[in-house]
Structure formats: structure tokens, C-alpha cells
Amino acid sequence: MRFTKKGNKIDIDKAEREIVEAIDLGVNYFDTAYIYPGNEVALGEILSRNNCRHKINIATKLPQYLIKSKKGIDKYFNEQLSRLKTTYIDYYLMHMLTDIAAWEKLKNLGIEEWIKEKKEKGEIRNIGFSFHGNTEMFLKILNAYDWDFCQIQYNYMDENSQAGKIGLKAAYDKGIPVIIMEPLRGGKLVDLLPHKAKEIISKSPRGYSAAEWSFRWLYNQKEVSCVLSGMNSIEMLRENVKIASSTQIDSFTEEDYKTIEEIKSEINANIKVGCTGCGYCMPCPMGVDIPATFRCYNEMYTENKKSGRKEYFQLTAFKKDINDASRCIGCGKCEKHCPQHIKIREKLKEARGELQTPWIKLQLKALRILKPWQ
């Protein structure tokens, strides 16, 4: 849940009312992470106060990007147990894996043996990973270990980006449950919809809200195991539970799919690059993640500039092999394979100019020097 703040601290009393209500309504999966300020502590305190730890599943994440030794793994894990006031974690994730190199680093630190030990002791019940990257990397990580579950960003606008539909189906085919994050793209598929998209929703005979269209599109798919939603009000909580409990797999009609496509069309009307994310331009000999760069560039204009730049930094900064757009040398190899005939070199230059602000450039430079992944 997304806890409401009172000043600089979480409003623990309000959060408690929301969590207790959620449990009463049947919600049993609570997602948090080490780097969410105050979140683990608040959740642990509330569960302890109400003696309801046994009723729910806690999912939290190892900040793998901060770890440089096996001792570091134990340090963060033990601190999380203390924060959450529990002796075990139901669903433990390697947080924000972006490429196979991040997993290989953890393997070299002995993570596989560590996981085996924690599972045998009952301190971890399920092991997984949360992913931010492209489909190719998702498939590599998916097949690199015997995962119990995984977590991906997925919504009707990200169907063909990040892990995407291909990644979702691949996990399902392997029998790996998939947890969905960002079903509303951080609320943007509700709050930042173009006027014409809102009109399409309001005129639909279904009578669904913008959020309901997004959730129903997800719940319609058999490959989706669980959908996360950042809720900070009782009203939002009740609405989301109602939608989840009233949606069936394969319940979408042709008209429903048509409505989603019309909404997407209006959102895409403001895109800067007609990239479909097919990946035929890859691999770039210099390592530039071309589809991801264009996706973030488009996001600046279909949503807002801050979110596009934030995602760009997230996707480029924490990789062992730096892959930001500034590495393009203009060789043109990518353009020979683009089915959309995009002038990739020209568009990468445009994207770099808007995505790489002086502040982002400074942070990327610092990360290259510090190399926290080593």
C-alpha cells in the first residue's frame, strides 16, 4: 500500500485503519521494500498491534544494487526482519534487476547458497525478482534460476515493452506466478489521460472508470497471478477490491478490446518516435538500449517529462554495462533492421538532448566512477 504521510512521517493511524480494512476485505498480499522510507517499519508495527501477521503474506525486497558482499545480504535481510517484526518473509525479491549482470554479481557473492539456507530455515518461503528492463533480459533472468515467482511492470500501455506480453507468457508457461506492478503506471492511466481518452471512457456503455478499465484488462488474462495497487484511502481500497472480486478471466469482449485500443491511440497521439519496441534494431554494438530510450522519450510527452526522465535514469544507471544514449557513435547498423524505418540516429540525438539533463548526466558520471555494482 502507499501510506499517507503526516509531515515527514507515515500517518500510522490512518495506515492502520486501511490495512485492517484491507485484511477484512480479503487482501492477503502486502508489498514493500527496504528503500521505501518508513514503509517496512509501519507495516510491521501495524501487523504486530493487530496480531494479524499470520493472516497475510509479506513481500519485500533485497536492495541488490547496494550489496557488495555476502555479509551485506545478511545485514539487509536481518534488518528487514527486525523492521517487519517477523521471523520469516513469505515472498522475497531481488529488487529491480535490470539485466543478467546484476544476477551474476549476486551469484558470485553466493546468493544461491544463501537462498537455500534461508529456505531450509523457513526464513524465506518464496524467492523471486522484480524486473525493470527489456524482454530479452527478462527471459535470461527468468531462465537463470529456479524462481518461485516474479514481478513485472505491466499494463495496457506496456504490453510490448519491458518484460511485456512475451515475458508474461514465458513465465506462465514455466509455471512461475507473475505479480503485476504499475497497473496504472503510477496513476498516470487515470490522472494524466488525454481529454479525448477520457471522453471514450465516459461514453462507453460499460460505465467503467479509467482505473477499472486498466484493472479489468489485467484480470482478464490468465497469466496474471496478482496485481499490486498503491492505495491510500478506504474508498480506493474498496473500489479496487470490488473490481478484483467481480472480474473473470477471458471476460473481455471484442468491443472491450476495441475500447482499450481507442484509449491507447489517443495516448499515443503525442508520441515523439513511432517505435513499437520490437527490438529488431538490437543489439547496438555500443550497448545503447534503443527501444528503452525511445519509450522513455515518448513517456515524456504522453505522460510527463519527470516520469520519462526518471524511468530513463532507472533503466540506464544501475547496469554494469552503461547503456545510455550518449554511447551512440552513429554507425547506422540499427536503421538497416528497423521495420518502422525510423531515423534512429537522428531520434536518439533528440532523445538524448531531452532525457539527459545536466543533473542526470552528473549522476551517470558519478555512478561510472563509483561502480556500486562491483
For every predicted segment, state its role:
Residues 1-56:
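N-terminal binding-site loop/beta-alpha segment at the start of enzyme catalytic domains
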Residues 41-60, 112-122, 173:
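Alpha-helix-loop-beta-strand connector modules within alpha/beta enzyme cores
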Residues 2-10, 20, 24, 67-184, ...:
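Glycine/proline-rich, positively charged
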Residues 34, 38, 98, 132-133, ...:
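Short beta->alpha linker loops
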Residues 54-66, 92-95:
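A short, structured active-site edge motif that brings together acidic residues
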Residues 28-34, 125-129, 151-152, 226-228, ...:
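Short catalytic-loop micro-motif centered on adjacent basic/acidic residues
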Residues 54-57, 146-153, 248-254:
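Short hydrophobic/aromatic-enriched beta-strand-loop microsegments
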